[in-house]
Swiss-Prot record:
It catalyses: 7-carboxy-7-deazaguanine + NH4(+) + ATP = 7-cyano-7-deazaguanine + ADP + phosphate + H2O + H(+). It comes from Thermococcus kodakarensis (strain ATCC BAA-918 / JCM 12380 / KOD1) (Pyrococcus kodakaraensis (strain KOD1)). The lineage of its organism: Archaea, Methanobacteriati, Methanobacteriota, Thermococci, Thermococcales. This is 7-cyano-7-deazaguanine synthase. Pathway: Purine metabolism; 7-cyano-7-deazaguanine biosynthesis. Belongs to the QueC family.
């Protein structure tokens, strides 16, 4: 039996991974990790929505130490104000790198993969499905093929059962992910990419700020990828 744990953070990438895993595995478990991020409450509600929508069990794990370490580093993703950017600014590598530094949670993907690996090791093995992609890999080193390769090397020594990291989006940008979401029939408008979400609409859609890097990447990817964006924004993203 093929088993997968999907690291689910609520955005386009992990939503695409969830639909993909549901199609490709016999058993799928969603794993959402809380560490005090600004969008945590919204993320949890989004996770609960897709858990019910796809009939996939959900585990939410809280890591207080990661919240403490994030505040120690001063990441804006935990209790801070994230930078506002435009689509044009995203093309400036220096701006993109500075934004990435601002929202960096110390060793987050290493920690999250370790948590998922522990769960799968307890269950007898399986795949950790992650939403790493080419667009974010350009500024986040822990979203690259090299990172996946090194983590899989580590897991050979760190687990008793056979556990590996699988990154189905690793060669896709946001446009490609948008196309995949459409192909899979995903209700992406119920996902959340925003670093500073403004709550929910009456019918349960997250309200995105429209000004943070993640909102701009989301809007640009959907518009250029599938020619539409059903996301609700407080402010229309500038792409």
């Amino acid at each position: 039996m093929k088993r997968a744990v999907v690291l689910f953070s609520g955005g386009l990438d992990s939503t695409a991974c969830l639909y993909w895993a549901k199609k490709n595995y016999d058993e799928v478990i969603m794993l959402t990790v809380n560490y005090g991020s600004n969008e945590e409450k919204v993320t949890n509600k989004v996770a609960e929505f897709f858990s019910k929508e796809l009939d996939v069990p959900l585990k939410i794990v809280r890591l207080d130490f990661l919240e403490e370490f994030s505040k120690l580093r001063g990441t804006t993703l935990v209790g801070g104000e994230t930078p506002k950017v435009t689509g044009e600014e995203l093309e400036n590598i220096e701006v993109a790198q500075e934004t990435a530094k601002s929202v960096w949670v110390p060793a987050r993907n290493v920690v999250l993969i370790a948590v998922a690996a522990s769960l799968l090791d307890a269950l007898g093995g399986g795949d950790i499905v992650v939403g790493f992609n080419a667009e974010e890999g350009a500024t986040f080193p822990d979203n690259t093929p090299e990172f996946v390769e090194k983590m899989n090397e580590m897991l050979k020594y760190g687990t008793m059962a056979e556990v590996r990291v699988v990154a189905p989006l690793i060669n896709l940008d946001k446009r490609g992910i948008a196309k995949l979401l459409k192909e899979l029939g995903a209700k992406y408008e119920y996902s959340n990419s925003c670093y500073m979400p403004k709550g929910f609409t009456e019918d349960g859609k997250p309200i995105h700020c429209g000004e943070c890097e993640s909102c701009v990447r989301r809007h640009r990817g959907l518009i250029e990828g599938i020619g539409e964006d059903k996301t609700v924004y407080a402010v229309e993203p500038k792409i």
